[in-house]
Amino acid sequence: MKPLLDVLVILDALEKEGSFAAASAKLFKTPSALSYTIHRLESDLNIQLLDRSGHRARFTPSGQMLLEKGREVLHIARELEIRAVKLQQGWEHTLRLA
């Protein structure tokens, strides 16, 4: 599900940047677009990812877990993309003999 990767990128930026405004500037999207995307995932999964009761949104335990595991998924997705490009360009895997 591609939109899930988009949400993971948004959650990562939100945690790193500290606010919807800063995350939206980094991702070249509006704060309302980020908020809507996160809210839609919360509705789809029937969980709350962010506690919005204070001045700044904070990750709930579920949100923190999704952020941490999501970062692993993003890392693997980036690695997969890099490997696919290298393979297409003729790079081969290396074999190490000990």
Give the residues covered by each predicted segment:
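Residue cluster at the C-terminal edge of the helix-turn-helix DNA-binding motif
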Residues: 17, 26, 40-48
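Interdomain hinge and pocket-entrance segments immediately C-terminal to HTH DNA-binding domains
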Residues: 85-98
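Helix-turn-helix DNA-binding elements, focusing on the entry/boundary residues of the two helices
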Residues: 19-20, 38, 52
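Short helix-boundary/capping micro-motifs
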Residues: 12-28
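Short helix-coil-helix linker/hinge
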Residues: 1-6, 90
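A short LG(V/I)-centered, amphipathic sequence patch enriched
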Residues: 42-61
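Alpha-helical linker/hinge and terminal dimerization helices associated
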Residues: 7, 44-45, 66-88
